[in-house]
């Protein structure tokens, strides 16, 4: 026992000296009240995607990567996250390295463009320094970088068109992420990188697709979302939107590999009503018999599009159904978080 007491005393002295040197909270036991067990989140604007992420949205204080082919809905998802952060009273920033942000579309998605900070940097270094400065301020809830592929190193911009710049962008991203990760964690900012897709040459077997910017972002990201368009939504002969599938290919805060399907309507963004209909049917909240949908014995309409329109015209009913879906999801999430703790106590 004496040897055990000596060890504990030595450990406590070490902890005290660490806290004296680096400040209180620099080292702690994981289960202490000061160490948050439930991750703080920002909703994505799609209840289906919130459920697929397992925690109700994208995590604060973490790095998130959203990637996919062109016109798949990557920027739309990012703008919805910004809109949700603003609805919660937060501040958001959009670093537009592609110089392609459409303010009218952003407003249609619910973004308060008068209070959205926007930067259109000249070089990759400038973009990442602006990002770091915003995160260090501690006043930003979400910062979006669109996109990694457009973060051009200064040496490449200053050089000639045909010059080879092997690995410059990868080195830039690796250095920036080493600096950013700790700052992002302390500030509770969600740092969201949008990325494109490239194809590796000469791949015979397996997936030839990769993302630009080296491997650093893959490692440092707590969540990676793959966004793909799977179908086109039509009304008669008119194309009115696209059916989008998001796969959670990496998740450090919940079980990964879950998939969310939702509608993105052209000019409007993610269809809230479409996700409500799909999830309510899956959970048994709304009954589907043939083409008819009913809720608590009352018919909502015939056909999915008609039910979406009905919910759009009856926001109180839509809010009630959403509350039931989120309530069940949150109960399951809290039960999953409490299960290991209950097991430890036995």
Curated annotation (Swiss-Prot):
Molecular function per GO: ATP binding; ATP hydrolysis activity; ATP-dependent DNA damage sensor activity; damaged DNA binding; single-stranded DNA binding
Listed GO biological process terms: DNA recombination; DNA repair; SOS response
A Pfam family hit: RecA_C
Protein keywords: ATP-binding, Cytoplasm, DNA damage, DNA recombination, DNA repair, DNA-binding, Nucleotide-binding, SOS response
Entry's Gene Ontology cellular component terms: cytosol
Subcellular compartments: Cytoplasm
Binding site for ATP: 68-75
Xref: SUPFAM superfamilies: P-loop containing nucleoside triphosphate hydrolases (SSF52540), RecA protein, C-terminal domain (SSF54752)
Superkingdom of the source species: Bacteria
Main location: cytoplasm
Free-text function comment from the UniProt entry: Can catalyze the hydrolysis of ATP in the presence of single-stranded DNA, the ATP-dependent uptake of single-stranded DNA by duplex DNA, and the ATP-dependent hybridization of homologous single-stranded DNAs. It interacts with LexA causing its activation and leading to its autocatalytic cleavage.
Annotated family: Belongs to the RecA family.
Name of the featured protein: Protein RecA
Species for this entry: Heliobacterium modesticaldum (strain ATCC 51547 / Ice1)
Phylogenetic placement of the source organism: Bacteria, Bacillati, Bacillota, Clostridia, Eubacteriales
Gene: recA
């Amino acid at each position: 026992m004496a040897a055990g007491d000596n060890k504990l005393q030595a450990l406590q002295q070490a902890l005290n000296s660490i806290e004296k040197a680096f400040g209180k909270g620099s080292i702690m036991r994981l289960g202490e009240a000061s160490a948050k067990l439930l991750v703080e989140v920002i909703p994505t604007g799609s209840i289906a995607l919130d459920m697929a992420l397992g925690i109700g949205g994208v995590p604060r204080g973490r790095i998130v990567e959203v990637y996919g082919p062109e016109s798949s809905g990557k920027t739309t998802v990012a703008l919805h996250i910004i809109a949700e952060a603003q609805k919660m009273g937060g501040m958001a920033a959009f670093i537009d390295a592609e110089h392609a942000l459409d303010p009218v579309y952003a407003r249609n998605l619910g973004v308060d463009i008068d209070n959205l900070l926007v930067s259109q940097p000249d070089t990759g270094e400038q973009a990442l320094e602006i990002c770091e400065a915003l995160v260090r301020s501690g006043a930003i809830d979400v910062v979006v970088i669109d996109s990694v592929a457009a973060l051009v190193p200064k040496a490449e911009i200053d050089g000639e068109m045909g010059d080879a710049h092997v690995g410059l962008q990868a080195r830039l991203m690796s250095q920036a992420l080493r600096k950013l990760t700790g700052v992002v964690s302390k500030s509770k900012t969600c740092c969201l990188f949008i990325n494109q897709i490239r194809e590796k040459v000469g791949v015979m077997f397996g997936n030839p697709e990769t993302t630009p910017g080296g491997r650093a972002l893959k490692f440092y990201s707590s969540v990676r979302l793959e966004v793909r368009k799977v179908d086109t939504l039509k009304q008669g002969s008119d194309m009115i939107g696209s059916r989008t599938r998001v796969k959670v290919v990496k998740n450090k805060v919940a079980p990964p590999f879950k998939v969310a399907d939702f509608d993105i309507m052209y000019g409007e963004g993610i269809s809230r009503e479409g996700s409500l209909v799909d999830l309510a049917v899956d959970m048994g909240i709304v009954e589907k018999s043939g083409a008819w949908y009913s809720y608590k014995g009352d018919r909502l309409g015939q056909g999915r599009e008609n039910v979406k329109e009905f919910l759009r015209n009856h926001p109180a009913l839509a809010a009630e159904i959403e509350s039931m879906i989120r309530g069940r999801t949150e109960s399951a999430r809290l039960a999953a978080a409490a299960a290991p703790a209950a097991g430890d106590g036995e």
